[in-house]
Regions:
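Conserved alpha-helical segments that form or flank metal/cofactor-binding pockets of metalloenzymes
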Residues: 40-76, 138-149
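Alpha-helical scaffold segments that form or flank carboxylate-/histidine-based iron centers
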Residues: 9-18, 38-57, 93-99, 122-136
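Alpha-helical bundle segments that constitute or directly flank the non-heme di-iron/ferroxidase center
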Residues: 2-36, 94-119
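Membrane-interacting alpha-helical segments
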Residues: 1-12, 66, 86-93, 145-149
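Generic structural concept
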Residues: 19, 23, 33, 49, ...
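Preference for long, well-ordered alpha-helical segments
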Residues: 103-149
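Carboxylate-rich helix-loop segments that flank metal/cofactor sites and access channels
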Residues: 57-108
Length: 149
């Protein structure tokens, strides 16, 4: 799935869309934890979900500062992110992790763009860069774990 998050014209719009994207990611992580068979994979994925939970908290604080709405759940894209995981679960852990890696592509791209957004304040840029580093780490682990399974 190709994301347009990070291309918003305003910082408040960007923060709102990042919050939606994070909620979509969290829903996919919950599906993944439920469907993975390998307990070590479940544990690692749960740790990554905690990163996404932290991203929502940090973005919610930033939203208050920039006058953005704090969404409490994802949007229609959530059906795509969770649907990929549900379908992949029929083929096992490797397929689930591959589906999650493709979901991580969107978050990596979104935070990379957000870090370069023209209206990003130094505080916002710090939040975006830290989240981007998390997403790169998640994507790399998903790729390696899917290949090893």
């Amino acid at each position: 799935m190709v994301t347009t998050v990070g291309m918003e014209s305003t910082l408040s719009g960007l923060v709102e869309d990042l919050i939606l994207l994070e909620h979509d990611a969290i829903a996919a992580y919950e599906q993944t934890i439920e469907r993975l068979q390998n307990p070590q994979y479940k544990q690692q994925v749960a740790a990554f979900k905690a990163d996404h939970d932290r991203h929502v908290q940090e973005l919610a604080q930033l939203a208050s500062a920039v006058g953005a709405e704090v969404h409490r759940e994802g949007d229609m894209k959530q059906m795509l992110t969770t649907g990929k995981v549900a379908l992949a679960s029929m083929m096992g852990d490797s397929a689930i992790l591959t589906a999650m890696r493709t979901n991580e592509e969107d978050t990596v791209t979104a935070y990379e763009r957000a870090s370069r957004h023209s209206e990003a304040t130094p505080e916002a840029r710090t939040i975006f860069e830290r989240a981007h580093a998390d997403e790169l780490r998640h994507r790399e682990w998903m790729s390696q774990a899917a290949s090893a399974t």
